[in-house]
Swiss-Prot record:
GO cellular component: host cell membrane; membrane; virion component
Chief location: host cell
Entry-listed glycosylation sites: 61, 95, 102, 111, 139, 148, 152
Protein name, UniProt field: Uncharacterized protein L778
Organism of origin: Acanthamoeba polyphaga mimivirus
């Protein structure tokens, strides 16, 4: 199973909610009539409208190192270059890079020594010691923080990105993306998947029970060579019959003279 690493591009999901959620943008949250901070949007959508984040190391020397429960990192939103940080019980998106923007993963399986994409975990803020928690405040869904929360509302899971990679995994039926379903229209065997190249995966496929299996890889932008060959012969055949028809017409006209 593939380990989660510093530098990975990920989608952030909450898989244990009655309706699983995915981070998919940001919106102003007013703290005073004329003052606001951005908070992440959560929806029951899919990778198609999901918002990806980079697991940014605090120490540059940790780049590409696999995470463990002691690893500390920031979560940087790719589209806006903003960081998730905990402030007064609400998780915001901003430019803060102090310890309130530092996070660690606490696996649901407390015996885990490394963390891979199959695992669920809690996000623990290093500045406050609180867990990130899904909440609804005034009919608005957001991420708050609470010390030692043990509910399903604080259980998270990362899906490896970027979007093109996640898209290919959905089209291959990778169960990490389909259970719960975060694929939307990108379902294995669907018409939208026919033109999407596959990407190498170390995750289990829905169609196999083998963990660590590797899917075949098709280069980006390529089509099966048999299709190209068939199209070529159709064109050559069409040109041949057009030439035959022209010769036949000329012969008939010559005979009628």
């Amino acid at each position: 199973m593939s380990a989660i690493r510093y530098g990975d591009n990920v989608f952030i999901t909450l898989p244990r909610l009655s309706t699983p959620m995915i981070f998919n943008g940001l919106v102003p949250h007013y703290t005073k009539p004329n003052q606001y901070e951005y908070v992440p949007i959560l929806s029951s959508g899919s990778i198609a409208n999901g918002d990806s984040y980079i697991i940014e190391p605090i120490n540059i020397n940790n780049s590409n190192t696999a995470l463990n429960p002691q690893s500390v990192f920031r979560l940087k939103q790719v589209s806006q270059n903003k960081y998730l940080y905990d402030n007064n019980g609400i998780v915001y998106l901003g430019n803060d890079t102090d310890n309130k923007a530092n996070w660690s993963l606490k696996p649901v399986n407390l015996n885990a020594t490394t963390i891979d994409y199959n695992q669920e975990f809690r996000l623990v803020n290093q500045g406050t010691g609180n867990n990130a928690v899904f909440s609804t405040i005034n009919n608005v869904t957001m991420i708050t923080s609470k010390y030692n929360d043990t509910t399903n509302n604080s259980i998270f899971k990362f899906l490896k990105g970027p979007f093109t990679y996640a898209q290919s995994q959905c089209c291959q039926g990778n169960i990490l993306y389909t259970r719960p379903n975060m694929c939307g229209i990108y379902k294995q065997g669907s018409s939208v998947c026919h033109t999407i190249p596959s990407s190498q995966s170390n995750y289990p496929s829905y169609t196999t029970s083998m963990v660590g299996s590797t899917q075949s890889t098709t280069p980006v932008g390529s089509n099966p060579p048999t299709h190209r060959s068939i199209d070529k012969w159709y064109i050559i055949g069409g040109i041949f019959w057009v030439i035959v028809l022209i010769i036949l017409v000329i012969f008939i006209i010559w005979k009628l003279k």
